[in-house]
């Protein structure tokens, strides 16, 4: 006989665990099912090289929402943020730019390249932060459906519009961010390519876009919306990114949450238009009237459900939902940290740059995208080297270090050859760039883990290895994420919900889709009990 729960969560990533923890706190008997042998999804810490613990996929803490941290009491369960330094951007010719929370410090760095750009930076920061403040409010909203004409939907849309009535002319600032390229947006403020590249760099992180791609300006804002104090809101987590998901899981377990690993879901069961449970690949069944899927919308709707039972327009929308990925991750165990020629501790004001961007100009970033656009890996990739072991002594042996390299572009599909035969070429391209700024770094490598988009897809199930479960473009955001009419975390199957990064507000280790989905689940449950 199938074991019964009040709610089942498919996928033990941070959003699934967050949703499950909130439901457990509300008194629901809740089960989380994870395909892998370890909980965490893209927020995991694993010992791939003996003695070295890698944050295998996600690598920096920024977007985890303060409400999730507080409600789930994560600090009680081992969650501790360690500071990242100001962002250090080495440039050719042994120069550099510093991008810091301290506006005056950033201005001083900019002023060595352009007095005009330095002078206008505080105005730009205030202008961008106005939009960020609006987006931070939108994070916790359930997107209404403005196209629906029933009274309930009309009231929800009217309530939403009234709530944000004071946005006024700032609406046009948001439209600019949603539609303009990063280069065009930044060129309205800055003149030097090196300075524009400091911010435009974010527009390519995790997305198949370059700084000249329409809509790429929004991705800058997505990455700076975090409310954690630090360089642009960035920090490390003691014990690696897996410490976040372990803390969420433990918080849930204290309230009765059940988490099971090595449980691959094969199908979501339904009867009479209502969710009734799940079936695993080994035939095991679990029953529940509430099922929340933390996996990609493509898997939820196109693999776990019978498409014939879904509205044809939803199937078409999900089939065309863009998930093509060009992100790679290389985790390195090494004898020593990269020693950047352009870094001077006295001049920079900190001991070592734990957070670095290699992508010196707009043109460099666009060339990296151009290679991928035509089906090849970037010959000169942009790279984010982060060095958590400089501040975290729990992840590497004494005197040794962990360096995480995230970057782009490495297309899921290559025009010539495949990743099985060309992965070493990617490594060479990446290390050539690192060694160009930090000579001799590659000589001290002890071991590494190389993840291309197909590797990421195989390990955590995100289609095409997309780290956000789908592109962050205007047609795939808010009331269109993952599809029009189904952005409120619900689905055409009553009792089946979406709680992962395919839902609003998208990817990043933030916990917001899980939080929002749990709120809607509990709201529906309360409504049903009154009927």
Where are these regions (language model features)?
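A conserved beta-strand/loop element that lines the FAD pocket in flavoprotein oxidoreductases
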Residues: 251-265
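Mid-domain catalytic core of redox enzymes
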Residues: 231, 237, 264-396
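Helix-rich C-terminal "cap"/substrate-channel and partner-interaction subdomain
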Residues: 123-156, 381-479
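A glycine-rich dinucleotide-binding beta-alpha-beta segment and adjacent secondary-structure elements
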Residues: 192, 196-212, 357, 375-388, ...
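A conserved FAD-binding loop/helix module that cradles the flavin
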Residues: 501-522
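N-terminal glycine-rich phosphate/pyrophosphate-binding loop and immediately adjacent elements
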Residues: 3-146
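Active-site/ligand-binding neighborhood in enzyme catalytic cores
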Residues: 129-255, 462-477
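Extreme N-terminal leader/targeting segments of oxidoreductases
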Residues: 1-7, 25-26, 229, 477-491, ...
């Amino acid at each position: 006989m199938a074991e019964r729960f009040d709610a089942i969560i498919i996928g033990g990533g941070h959003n699934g665990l967050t949703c499950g923890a909130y439901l457990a706190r509300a008194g629901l008997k809740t089960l989380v099912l994870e395909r892998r042998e370890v909980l965490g999804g893209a927020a995991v810490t694993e010992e791939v090289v003996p003695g070295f613990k890698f944050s295998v996929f996600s690598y920096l803490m920024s977007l985890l929402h303060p409400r999730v941290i507080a409600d789930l009491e994560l600090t009680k369960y081992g969650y501790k943020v360690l500071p990242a330094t100001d962002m250090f951007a080495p440039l050719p010719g042994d120069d550099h730019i510093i991008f810091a929370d301290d506006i005056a410090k950033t201005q001083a760095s900019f002023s060595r390249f352009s007095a005009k750009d330095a002078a206008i930076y505080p105005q730009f920061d205030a202008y961008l932060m106005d939009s960020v403040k609006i987006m931070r409010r939108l994070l916790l909203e359930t997107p209404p459906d403005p196209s629906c004409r029933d009274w309930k939907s009309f009231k929800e849309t009217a309530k939403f519009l009234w709530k944000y009535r004071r946005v006024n002319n700032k609406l046009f600032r948001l439209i600019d961010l949603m539609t303009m390229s990063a280069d065009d947006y930044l060129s309205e403020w800055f003149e030097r390519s090196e300075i524009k590249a400091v911010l435009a760099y974010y527009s390519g992180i995790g997305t198949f876009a370059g700084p000249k791609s329409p809509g790429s300006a929004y991705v800058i804002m997505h990455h700076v919306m975090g409310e954690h104090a630090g360089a642009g809101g960035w920090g490390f987590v003691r014990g690696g990114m897996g410490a976040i998901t372990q803390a969420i899981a433990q918080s849930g377990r204290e309230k009765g949450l059940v988490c099971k690993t090595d449980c691959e879901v094969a199908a979501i069961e339904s009867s009479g238009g209502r969710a009734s449970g799940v079936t695993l690949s080994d035939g095991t069944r679990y029953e529940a009237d509430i099922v929340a899927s933390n996996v990609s919308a493509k898997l939820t709707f196109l693999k776990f459900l019978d498409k014939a039972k879904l509205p044809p327009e939803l199937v078409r929308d999900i089939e065309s939902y863009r998930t093509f990925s060009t992100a790679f991750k290389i985790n390195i165990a090494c004898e020593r940290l990269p020693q950047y020629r352009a870094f001077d501790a006295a001049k920079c004001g900190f001991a070592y740059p734990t957070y670095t961007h290699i992508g010196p100009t707009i043109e460099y970033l666009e060339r990296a995208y151009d290679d991928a656009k035509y089906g090849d890996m970037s010959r000169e990739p942009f790279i984010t080297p982060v060095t958590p072991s400089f501040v975290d002594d729990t992840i590497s042996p004494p005197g040794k270090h962990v360096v995480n390299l995230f970057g782009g572009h490495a297309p899921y599909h290559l025009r010539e050859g495949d990743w099985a035969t060309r992965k070493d070429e990617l490594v060479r391209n990446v290390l050539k760039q690192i060694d160009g700024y930090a000579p001799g770094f590659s000589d001290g490598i002890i071991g590494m883990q190389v993840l291309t988009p197909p590797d990421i897809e195989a390990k955590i199930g995100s289609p095409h290895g997309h780290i956000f479960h789908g592109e962050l473009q205007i047609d795939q955001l808010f009331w269109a994420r993952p599809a029009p009419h189904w952005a409120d975390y619900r689905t055409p199957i009553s009792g089946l919900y979406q709680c992962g990064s395919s839902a609003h507000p998208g990817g990043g280790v933030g916990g917001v889709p899980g939080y929002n989905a749990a709120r809607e689940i509990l709201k529906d449950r309360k409504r049903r009990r009154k009927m």
